[in-house]
Each structure stands twice: as structure tokens, then as C-alpha cells.
């Protein structure tokens, strides 16, 4: 199962295999299949998720925006662009893309994915919070970033159990990093310990 290979290689930090597997999974799903089975749209987003995970910003910047009727894909596209711009110091563009992540959260297309059993709205909210927190991190606003990341962790903890998980990495890792940057070492240790237990 190439989807599991993508998830495992992403978790293990094997960037080349993660990206290769992500592209394969994405190519397996056609636009026509997504229109017939809405939750399959998730598989179209995973190359972007790999690019973000491994800081392949050039790949994010050159990625073609999905068709407008693929609302979840556009949300993840905006998330990826927001984080990439923040990492490159372009905070105006980072904020612009972050502001668009939840634009279509009540759309017919997103509701169809939710009705099919996919926690699409929760994933969009996590993406929005992570992008917002990333912007604050690159602005050295660690307290604000920590607040966003804590909220993202709370939402991720409510996601239904599945393998691979619905969100592509444990957001506690991002929270722990922000706590370290804020010199909140004891709290960071607790967050990383909880992540290992989960």
C-alpha cells in the first residue's frame, strides 16, 4: 500500500521516499474519481504535505493550484504556501494565504467529504492554526505561536483513529519546538514525552 509507505517514510524522515510515494498516491486518483467519491480528494494533497514536512519550499512555490472545485485541496495548497512564505521571511504573503485556508470550510464539496466520514473541517482548522503559528514563530512571537499550536493539538486529539492518521504528523512536535524556542523547557519535555506515548 503506497499510502502506508508514504506515511511511514514521512514519519522516519526519509524525504525522497516520502515525496516519491506521495506523488504516486496522488497520481492514482483522478479528478473523476474524486467527484464520484469525495473523500479521495485527500490523496491529491499529500505531495504538498511532504514538501512542507521536508521544507521543500521551491516545490511548494512551483506547485500548480488545484481546480477550484476541489475545496479541500485548495485549503491545503493555501496552508503550504503560507508556511513556505513564512519560512522565507515573506510574512505579508504568508498572512494572505493563511487567511484563505478556511474560505471554503462550509462549501458543498467539503460537507460532502464530511458526510463520507472524513474529518475535513478539523484538518482545515489544524492547517489554519499551524500556518498562523508558523507566521508567529518566524516573527519571534512565541507565546502567540504556542497558543495556536496548542489549539491544533487539541483538535488533532479529537480526530477519529485510523491508520495512517488523518493528519500527516503529530502536531505536538511543532508545539514542543515552539516551547523550546520560548525557553519553556519543562513544558516542552512533557509535550515530547506525551507525543512518544501516543
Segments from the language model and where they lie:
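Residue at a conserved register position within TPR or TPR-like alpha-solenoid repeats
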Residues: 8-9, 51, 85, 136, ...
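Solenoid-like repeat scaffolds
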Residues: 26-35, 63-72, 100-111, 116-121, ...
Amino acid at each position: 500500500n503506497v499510502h502506508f509507505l508514504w506515511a511511514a517514510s514521512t514519519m522516519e524522515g526519509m524525504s525522497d521516499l516520502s515525496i516519491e510515494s506521495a506523488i504516486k498516491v496522488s497520481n492514482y486518483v483522478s479528478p473523476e474519481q474524486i467527484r464520484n467519491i469525495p473523500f479521495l480528494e485527500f490523496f491529491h494533497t499529500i505531495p504538498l504535505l511532504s514538501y512542507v514536512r521536508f521544507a521543500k519550499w521551491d516545490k511548494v512555490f512551483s506547485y500548480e493550484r488545484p481546480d477550484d472545485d476541489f475545496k479541500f485541496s485548495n485549503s491545503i495548497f493555501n496552508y503550504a504556501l503560507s508556511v513556505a512564505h513564512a519560512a522565507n521571511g515573506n510574512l505579508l504573503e504568508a498572512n494572505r494565504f493563511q487567511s484563505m485556508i478556511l474560505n471554503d470550510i462550509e462549501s458543498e464539496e467539503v460537507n460532502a467529504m464530511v458526510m463520507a466520514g472524513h474529518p475535513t473541517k478539523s484538518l482545515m482548522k489544524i492547517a489554519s492554526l499551524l500556518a498562523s503559528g508558523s507566521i508567529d514563530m518566524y516573527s519571534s512571537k512565541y507565546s502567540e505561536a504556542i497558543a495556536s499550536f496548542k489549539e491544533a493539538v487539541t483538535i488533532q486529539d479529537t480526530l477519529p483513529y485510523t491508520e495512517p492518521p488523518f493528519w500527516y504528523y503529530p502536531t505536538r512536535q511543532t508545539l514542543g519546538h515552539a516551547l523550546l524556542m520560548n525557553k519553556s523547557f519543562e513544558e516542552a519535555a512533557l509535550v515530547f514525552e506525551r507525543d512518544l506515548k501516543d
